[in-house]
Regions:
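Asp-centered catalytic/switch region of ABC-type ATPase nucleotide-binding domains
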Residues: 77, 103-105
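Helical hairpin unit composed of two closely spaced alpha helices linked by a short loop
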Residues: 97, 106-107
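Nucleotide-state-sensitive switch-loop elements of NTP-binding domains
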Residues: 1-79, 116, 120, 125-162
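A compositional/biophysical signature of low hydrophobicity enriched in polar/charged and small residues
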Residues: 81-84
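Non-catalytic positions within long, well-ordered alpha-helices that form the structural scaffold/packing
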Residues: 37, 100-101
Length: 162
């Protein structure tokens, strides 16, 4: 995953901060935060992929990462997105609930909407947790992600049903 992020950073000319193999994720976040502040970088994306809501140690790491972020920039994070695979189904609601307990979520990134999955669970997430979908992914190319459009999403969700 680290190599993949570094490769995407290279492709789009965006710096990527990584740590040594098996590094404490919070220390890598600290290094990224320090670099962003020192270089006047306005946007810092932190990828905590692989955090499963049923893995206490990984969720504890996520909590620690939140503390580190606030230590460096007390008013941060400004946005916290949860990436959800459109094919996850109702388990996505459970994920969103559990992650919301650890860190306030400001949006959903709905991925893999290019297959048969339609991602209708985001309606339940919006209803129960008031977390909007901000971005939607249709594939793996740089242009395959964009702002969420609720009208287009609903058309796709209902396509073939009515």
């Amino acid at each position: 995953a680290v190599a993949q992020l570094a490769e995407w950073g290279r492709r789009v000319d965006v710096p990527v901060v990584t740590g040594p193999e098996k590094a404490d994720p919070a220390s890598v976040v600290f290094d990224g935060m320090e670099r962003a502040v020192a270089e006047g970088i306005d946007i810092l994306m932190i990828d905590t992929a692989g955090r499963l809501q049923n893995k206490d140690n990984l969720m504890a790491e996520l909590e620690k990462i939140g503390r580190i972020i606030k230590r460096v920039v007390p008013e941060a994070p400004h946005e916290t997105f949860l990436a959800l695979d459109a094919s996850t189904g109702q388990n996505a609601l459970v994920q969103a609930k559990e992650f919301s307990k650890i860190t306030p979520l400001t949006g959903i990134v709905l991925t893999k909407i290019d297959g048969t999955a339609r991602g209708g669970v985001v309606l339940a997430i919006r209803e129960e947790l008031n977390i909007p979908v901000k971005l939607i992914g249709f594939g793996e190319k740089i242009d395959d992600i964009g702002e969420f459009n609720s009208e287009n999403f609903m058309k796709g969700l209902l396509e073939g049903l009515i």
